[in-house]
């Protein structure tokens, strides 16, 4: 079984990385075998260009825009009346509630043939709703001097270790302090206007969205300029992201994500232990009809149009506290929003610290507090009480370099909050 016994010995002040050629060996075992010996970035002798400072390069990426999308439906509200914006949001995947509200206020929605511009208007069963989705409003992303943990950089790509609580790109609720703002400063790019994506909650997605608009051909790219964000991580998720620094690299990496040839490995702490301890879960994922900020695993949802195909492979690395928690490795075959979190919840083992998907602090404490040694109970209470995010970390990222054609792979250790809990659970030895 894969061991990560070296985890507590990691230096957690600055994330380091190990880069190594692809091999059939487990990427995690290689990482944990070599990482304690690595003090700086390691480059294999494989012809990758020397590390260079980022030049002020303009990078064109596609807009995400569902403008003009229309629905004409009769309301079927089983529970009586429902807010107009809530009902429309539940009927359209990939469009944020804020975007729906903007469409209503602009007079693009009618109920029974009459324009309604009040988002809180109630509709009932039998009402006929006509809605046209409005244009995305451009956001201005300004360069900000935000410290970035650069794992690797050359003329074409940038690999970043994203910290917890950093949003990947600006959105209506997060206009500043994002990874994009920091990259604009790092690459000496000017502030830019661009259309925001539809992810207006805490998700940049766990990972890349396989939606068609994310892999639009270069000829249809909009004229706005911003760093080439190819995939995303949730606000609370830490770990590795690759950013394209030119149009060719963006298109090449986007195609790899579309073909699912990118290697993405995550580690998480779960509440409880997955059963069986190793396997593959293939359950479609779609928007949770009862909670707009949450996704849900929906068996059969693809046939009904409510969900999209999603598949994850998992393996229990280590169990703690008599089955109260487990360190789990995840490998993604698809890249749906909140995929790991939704699949873990469906399996009955939500991620520790994931309040949205059921891995609450109270649940974690009920499972762990009495199962650790008495001397460690006070510390486990403190550590879990401080955990304000899902215990999920993107630990390995591998892809084909868009310019050299070489398979490259990067790793970075989990951050201190996750490492401290794992260290305590392992030390407790129950």
Swiss-Prot record:
Gene3D superfamilies linked: Pseudouridine synthase, RNA-binding S4 domain
UniProt feature, compositional bias: Acidic residues: 196-214
Gene Ontology MF terms: pseudouridine synthase activity; RNA binding
DNA-binding as UniProt keyword: no
Main location group: plastid
Transit peptide: 1-43
Location relative to the cell: Plastid, Chloroplast
Listed Pfam families: PseudoU_synth_2 (PF00849), S4 (PF01479)
Record's GO cellular component terms: chloroplast
Keywords tagged on the record: Chloroplast, Isomerase, Plastid, RNA-binding, Transit peptide
Annotated catalysed reactions: a uridine in RNA = a pseudouridine in RNA
The keyword Transmembrane helix belongs to this UniProt entry's keyword annotation: no
Domain S4 RNA-binding: 82-155
UniProt EC number: 5.4.99.-
Ranges for region Disordered: 195-222
Residue ranges that the Swiss-Prot or TrEMBL entry lists as coiled coil: none
Catalytic residues (UniProt): 234
GO biological process, one term: pseudouridine synthesis
Homology family: Belongs to the pseudouridine synthase RluA family.
Protein name according to UniProt: RNA pseudouridine synthase 2, chloroplastic
Organism: Arabidopsis thaliana
High-level lineage: Eukaryota, Viridiplantae, Streptophyta, Embryophyta, Tracheophyta
């Amino acid at each position: 079984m894969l061991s990560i016994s070296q985890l507590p010995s990691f230096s957690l002040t600055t994330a380091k990385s190990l880069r190594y050629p692809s091999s059939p060996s487990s990427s995690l075992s290689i990482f944990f075998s070599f990482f304690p010996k690595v003090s700086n970035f390691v480059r294999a002798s494989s012809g990758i260009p020397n590390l260079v400072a980022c030049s002020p390069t303009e990078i064109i990426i596609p807009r995400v825009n569902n403008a003009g999308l229309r629905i004409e439906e009769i309301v079927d509200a089983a529970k009586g009346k429902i807010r107009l914006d809530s009902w429309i949001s539940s009927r359209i995947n990939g469009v944020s509630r804020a975007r729906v509200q903007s469409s209503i206020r602009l007079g693009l929605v009618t109920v029974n043939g009459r324009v309604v511009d009040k988002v809180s208007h109630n509709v009932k069963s039998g009402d006929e709703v006509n809605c046209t989705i409005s244009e995305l409003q451009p956001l201005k992303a300004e360069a900000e001097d935000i410290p970035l943990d650069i794992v690797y950089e050359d003329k074409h790509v940038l690999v970043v270790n994203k910290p917890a609580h950093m949003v990947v790109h600006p959105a209506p609720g997060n206009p500043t302090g994002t990874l994009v703002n920091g990259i604009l400063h790092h690459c000496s790019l000017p502030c830019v206007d661009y259309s925001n994506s539809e992810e207006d909650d805490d998700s940049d997605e766990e990972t890349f969205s396989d939606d068609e608009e994310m892999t639009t051909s270069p000829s249809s790219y909009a004229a706005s300029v911003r760093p080439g964000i190819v995939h995303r991580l949730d606000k609370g998720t830490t770990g590795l992201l690759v950013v394209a620094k030119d149009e060719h690299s963006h298109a090449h990496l986007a195609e790899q994500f579309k073909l699912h040839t990118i290697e993405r490995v995550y580690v998480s702490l779960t509440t409880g232990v997955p059963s069986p301890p190793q396997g593959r879960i293939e359950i479609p994922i779609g928007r949770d009809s009862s909670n707009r900020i949450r996704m849900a695993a929906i068996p059969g949802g693809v046939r009904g149009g409510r969900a999209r195909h999603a598949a994850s492979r998992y393996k229990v690395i280590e169990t703690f506290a008599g089955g109260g928690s487990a360190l789990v490795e995840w490998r993604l075959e698809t890249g749906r929003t909140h995929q790991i979190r939704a699949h873990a919840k469906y399996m009955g083992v939500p991620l520790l610290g994931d309040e949205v998907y059921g891995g609450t602090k109270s649940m974690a404490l009920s499972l762990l507090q009495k199962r650790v040694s008495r001397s460690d109970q006070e510390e486990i209470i403190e550590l879990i009480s401080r955990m304000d995010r899902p215990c999920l970390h993107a630990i390995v990222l591998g892809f084909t370099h868009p310019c050299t054609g070489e398979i490259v792979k990067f790793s970075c250790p989990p951050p201190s909050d996750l490492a401290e809990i794992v260290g305590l659970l392992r030390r407790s030895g129950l």
